[in-house]
Amino acid sequence: MSKETFQRTKPHINIGTIGHVDHGKTTLTAAITRALSAEGLANFCDYSSIDNTPEEKARGITINASHVEYETPNRHYAHVDCPGHADYVKNMITGAAQMDGAILVVSATDGAMPQTKEHILLARQVGVPYIVVFLNKIDMISQEDAELVDLVEMELSELLEEKGYKGCPIIRGSALKALEGDASYVEKIRELMQAVDDNIPTPEREVDKPFLMPIEDVFSISGRGTVVTGRIERGVVKVGDKVQIVGLRDTRETIVTGVEMFRKELPEGQAGENVGLLLRGIGKNDVERGMVICQPNSVKSHTQFKGTVYILQKEEGGRHKPFFTGYRPQFFFRTTDVTGVVTLPEGVEMVMPGDNVEFDVQLISPVALEEGMRFAIREGGRTIGAGTISKIIA
């Protein structure tokens, strides 16, 4: 039987469930597929099939994560659910499944718990732009405790607002009751998905963003000049476009005089394509792997940033010992690696394998950096951590 082709008729969104352990993230994921399967918009995935997660690797880190897909009448969703707290931290920091928005699951009986807070903070640091809240286990609240739910909601709204998530919709329901088919609770799942449809905007497509291509290789073609190759990360580049070469050395401007793909000339290259760009007046020694070619003034090179980082445990192939301020590993961004010096925040003496921490990095060479960008940390040829740039300092 021939493989089904992916029909792109609806906008595609990546989301995930986040929240404290045992508040019902996986049950909710199953309940969503059940409610939508009744309308022919999903295949029902039961709890055990989601909970039995495959291992995947992102930036050298093993993550357990389940990917489920479903549709609403308006959109196609890819939904990631992770079993353990550490897997969420790793998944969000490495960007294994970049989220356009998240469903924060909170048990109405417990309210916000430590991991609820940690996931909200992480979501902010790694750039998850929107959150919709599902207040779960509402069936376990008695009439006389109904007022407590209002307090839980108020506390949640304050928590979210503190971290920059204003006016997040909060839907009350019971994932378990919906999964069991209780009609009034299935309706709540539909209400939740409507809130997700309405409050998590479709992200801008990569081709609509300013052009950027990390340089992977440089060739010299006699009589024609210098060609740089790489995969276009975003935007579109056309013959005749003015571009900048950013990173490692002083920024330079040039003009793209040719775009090639598989040795064929093209009028333009766009996001996702592997291309060669012919650059006017640039010598082979003027450019190198690790620089980026981009739309003028869309990206600058920097040497100092704050990063949100997950440090691998010894069992994951990471370090065996802690590190301190002054630690100098290699930081990998796109196609380049640069040595950086770590400064730990005040009050943090050391970082242990398995920790999730935010610290400052001073790079020894300038690199084209942006907030929200992912990086890996390596030492002696192995990955010891991964992170996201939470703030550019200089």
From Swiss-Prot:
Pfam families reported in the protein's UniProt record: GTP_EFTU, GTP_EFTU_D2, GTP_EFTU_D3
PROSITE patterns linked to this entry: G_TR_1, G_TR_2
Record's keyword terms, sorted: Cytoplasm, Elongation factor, GTP-binding, Hydrolase, Magnesium, Metal-binding, Nucleotide-binding, Protein biosynthesis
Domain tr-type G: 10-204
Region described as G1: 19-26
GO CC annotation terms, alphabetical: cytosol
Keyword Amino-acid biosynthesis: no
Region of interest: G4: 136-139
Residues that coordinate or bind GTP: 19-26, 81-85, 136-139
EC primary class: hydrolase
Subcellular location: Cytoplasm
Substrates-to-products reaction catalysed: GTP + H2O = GDP + phosphate + H(+)
Binding site for Mg(2+): 26
Keyword Acyltransferase: no
Region (G5), start-end ranges: 174-176
EC number(s) from the headed UniProt entry: 3.6.5.3
Annotated region described as G3, given as residue ranges: 81-84
Region listing for G2, in residue ranges: 60-64
Any GO MF annotation of the entry: GTP binding
Protein family per UniProt: Belongs to the TRAFAC class translation factor GTPase superfamily. Classic translation factor GTPase family. EF-Tu/EF-1A subfamily.
Subunit text: Monomer.
HAMAP family with a match to the protein in the record: EF_Tu_B
Function: GTP hydrolase that promotes the GTP-dependent binding of aminoacyl-tRNA to the A-site of ribosomes during protein biosynthesis.
Protein name listed in UniProt: Elongation factor Tu
Lineage: Bacteria, Pseudomonadati, Chlamydiota, Chlamydiia, Chlamydiales
